[in-house]
Amino acid sequence: FTPSLSPSLIPEPTIKVFSTLFKNEFVGEKEFYLIPSPEIFMKEMIASGSGSIFQISSCFRNSEQLGDVHNPEFTMLEYYTMGFSDKDSISLTHEMIKETAISSPQWLKNDPLVITMEEAMKEYAGVDLIKAQDYGYLKSEAERLNLYVPDKENWEDTFNRIFLTYVEPSLPIDREVYLCDYPSQIECLAKNYPDRPYKKRWEM
């Protein structure tokens, strides 16, 4: 198992964390964080040659809503499979969910929807994500959608306003949805495409 306390964090500015202060009379004080996911340690292991790897671990995220969907402490399965494409990983995730589900709800019987962020922004918000590489266009689209954009707001925050208000609530709930190819402006531990302004990242 990788540590639950970390001196550094994954580059996910939208995730709020729990912090604590380590105190030692010989080495002084240092801030540590309860991990929001084991990603940073697991990717270090992969870089060191571990090969395919998985872990079931306790994770912690601050400022979460309390309920059936969100909780400040939760158990996460994180895995990385060497040689797998995004399509392979999505297929594996779907099969794992089917095999481990206690019941078989209708949404699990329906074929998953795999959609790129570019497609989702266009379909559910009418925003051209290629044109939105220009912040002026992105801001004007947010205003067209009647969203307030504060002065000096950055690209990621304006994008999230549109995504959280129009795209996420519009995604189908009768099947699994896999969002792929996140904008490269959103920092995360994922590779950039060489020919497109997106990162090789997907989320369910």
Predicted regions and their residues:
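Class II aminoacyl-tRNA synthetase-like tRNA-binding/catalytic domains
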Residues: 1-87, 98
